[in-house]
Curated annotation (Swiss-Prot):
Its main location: cytoplasm. SUPFAM superfamilies: Class II aaRS and biotin synthetases, tRNA-binding arm. This is Serine--tRNA ligase. NCBIfam families: serS. It is an enzyme of class 6 (ligase). GO terms for cellular component: cytoplasm. It is found in: Cytoplasm. Belongs to the class-II aminoacyl-tRNA synthetase family. Type-1 seryl-tRNA synthetase subfamily. GO terms for biological process: selenocysteine biosynthetic process; seryl-tRNA aminoacylation. It catalyses: tRNA(Ser) + L-serine + ATP = L-seryl-tRNA(Ser) + AMP + diphosphate + H(+); tRNA(Sec) + L-serine + ATP = L-seryl-tRNA(Sec) + AMP + diphosphate + H(+). Keywords: Aminoacyl-tRNA synthetase, ATP-binding, Cytoplasm, Ligase, Nucleotide-binding, Protein biosynthesis. Catalyzes the attachment of serine to tRNA(Ser). Is also able to aminoacylate tRNA(Sec) with serine, to form the misacylated tRNA L-seryl-tRNA(Sec), which will be further converted into selenocysteinyl-tRNA(Sec). Homodimer. The tRNA molecule binds across the dimer.
Length: 425
C-alpha cells in the first residue's frame, strides 16, 4: 500500500509514476481531495472537542457553586451532536480513501523500463543455447502420456480441466526437483519453512492479493480461509504486525507448497500441459531486508533462481519487466523464462520482485533500527525458485530423445536413485 503522506507531499512524482502503470491522475486527484477534506474535518473535530472540554469544566464549576448550568449543558449537547456528525463524515471519508488506496499498485523503481505490456519488457541476458534436434520433437504432454508419468485424462475425470495426476517416475521427478531446489536454497542461507496451505483474508490483504484480485483465488465458503495462490502469502505474513530486531536482517525464507489459482481470464490459454494449472507445486523464496540493501538482495535472489536453471542446464533468459507488466505489489521485477522447444519460445518459470515497503505497510511488518532505535518499515522481496511443474515440462522437452525416452539431468540423478533415463513403459 502506498504512503498517503507521500501522495500528499509528492503528488506529481507519484502521479507520474502511477501513470506508467495505467492509473489515471484523476483517481489520485480524488484521493488527494478526500485526504484534504479529512484533514480539515479532523481539525474541526479537535476544536469542537476542546470546546466541549471547556464546557464540561464550566458545568462542573457551576454545579459546585450551585448555579444554573442549563445553558452550558445545552451548549455541550450541541457540541457533542456536531462532533458525532463530523465523526460520521470522517468514517465515510476513511472508507472512501481505503477503497482507493488499497487498489492502487506500487510505484515503479526508477530503473524499471516504461511500457504498456509484455512487448515492452527488456531482455537483460541469456544463458545456454537451445538444443538443436535432428528428429521431430514432442510436446511435454505427449511425452508425459507416452512415458506413463502424467495423466490429464484422469485428472479431468476426478477433478476437472487443468488438473492432472503425476504417476510413476513423473511423481518421482517432481519430488526430486523440489528437493533439489530446496537443498540449493538452503546452501544460500534460506531457512526452510512448511507453511499453512490456507491463510485468512488479512494475510491475503497483507501481500496485496486482496481486495483487488479476489476472483483469482479459491475461497472456502463459510470460513475466513483461502487456499494459497503462492507460498509468498504465508511466508511474508509470518511477521505480520511484528517489529523485528534490525540486527536480524536480512532474513531469508524458502518453502515448497502447492499453489491454487482459479486462472480467471485465462480461458483458451495453455489449455494443454503443465504451464497453466489450477494446482501446482512451487518453491518460493521470500526475503525481509532493510531499505538500503533490498535491491542488492533482489539481484541475489534472481541469481539464486538462475543458479537452479544453470545446474539443470536449461537454457533461459532474464527480462526486466516494464511498468505495465509488473505485478500489483512490485516496485521492480525480473522474470526468468526457460526455453520450451515444442513451443519454440521462452516461457516464464520464475518471477523475482522487490515490493519495497508496499507489502510491509499493508501487513505492518517493521524493524527497529539498531543505529537510531527507531521503528521503520522494512522491504519485502519474493521470487519463484522455481515453479516445479514448468521445470518438469522444460526437462521433458529439452532432454527428450528420439526413441521417446527422456534423459535425467545429472544433478537430479542422486535424487532419483541413480536413474539416468526415463524410458517408455
Amino acid at each position: 500500500m502506498l504512503d498517503l503522506k507521500r501522495i500528499r507531499t509528492d503528488f506529481d512524482t507519484v502521479a507520474a509514476k502511477l501513470k506508467t502503470r495505467g492509473v489515471s491522475e484523476a483517481i489520485l486527484t480524488s484521493l488527494k481531495a478526500l485526504d484534504e477534506q479529512r484533514r480539515t474535518l479532523l481539525v474541526q473535530t479537535e476544536e469542537l472537542k476542546a470546546q466541549r472540554n471547556i464546557a464540561s469544566a464550566a458545568i462542573a464549576q457551576a454545579k459546585r457553586q450551585k448555579e444554573d448550568a442549563s445553558q452550558q449543558i445545552a451548549d455541550m449537547q450541541q457540541l457533542a451532536a456536531n462532533i458525532k456528525a463530523i465523526d460520521a463524515k470522517l468514517a465515510d471519508i476513511d472508507q472512501e480513501i481505503t477503497g482507493i488506496i488499497t487498489v492502487l499498485p506500487n510505484t515503479p523503481h526508477d530503473s524499471v523500463p516504461i511500457g504498456a505490456d509484455e512487448e515492452d519488457n527488456v531482455e537483460i541476458h541469456r544463458w545456454g543455447k537451445p538444443r538443436q534436434f535432428d528428429f521431430d520433437i514432442k510436446a511435454h504432454w505427449d511425452l508425459g502420456e507416452a512415458l506413463d508419468i502424467l495423466d490429464w485424462e484422469r485428472g479431468a475425470k476426478v477433478t476437472g480441466a487443468r488438473f492432472l495426476f503425476y504417476k510413476n517416475l513423473g511423481a518421482r521427478l517432481e519430488r526430486a526437483l523440489y528437493n533439489f531446489m530446496l537443498d540449493e536454497h538452503l546452501k544460500e542461507g534460506y531457512q526452510e519453512i512448511i507453511p499453512p496451505y490456507m491463510v485468512n483474508h488479512d494475510s491475503m490483504f497483507g501481500t496485496g492479493q486482496y481486495p483487488k484480485f479476489k476472483e483469482d483465488t479459491f475461497e472456502l465458503d463459510g470460513t475466513n480461509f483461502v487456499l494459497i495462490p503462492t507460498a509468498e502469502v504465508p511466508l511474508t505474513n509470518y511477521y505480520r504486525g511484528d517489529i523485528i530486531d534490525g540486527k536480524e536482517l536480512p532474513i531469508y525464507f524458502t518453502a515448497m507448497s502447492p499453489s491454487f489459482r482459479s486462472e480467471a481470464g485465462s480461458a483458451g490459454r495453455d489449455t494443454r500441459g503443465l504451464i497453466r494449472l489450477h494446482q501446482f507445486h512451487k518453491v518460493e523464496m521470500v526475503k525481509f531486508a532493510k531499505p538500503e540493501t533490498s535491491y542488492e538482495e533482489l539481484e541475489k535472489m534472481t541469481a539464486n533462481a538462475e543458479h537452479i536453471l544453470q545446474k539443470l542446464k536449461l537454457p533461459y533468459r532474464v527480462l526486466a519487466l516494464c511498468t505495465g507488466d509488473m505485478g500489483f505489489s512490485a516496485a521492480k521485477t525480473y522474470d526468468l523464462e526457460v526455453w520450451i522447444p515444442a513451443q519454440n519460445t521462452y516461457r516464464e518459470i520464475s518471477s523475482c520482485s522487490n515490493t519495497e515497503d508496499f507489502q510491509a505497510r499493508r501487513a505492518q511488518i517493521r524493524y527497529r533500527d539498531e543505529a537510531d532505535g527507531k521503528v521503520k518499515l522494512l522491504h519485502t522481496l519474493n521470487g519463484s525458485g522455481l515453479a516445479v511443474g514448468r521445470t518438469v515440462a522444460a526437462i521433458l522437452e529439452n532432454y527428450q530423445n528420439e526413441d521417446g525416452s527422456v534423459t535425467i539431468p545429472e544433478v537430479l540423478r542422486p535424487y532419483m536413485g541413480g536413474l539416468e533415463v526415463i524410458k517408455p513403459r
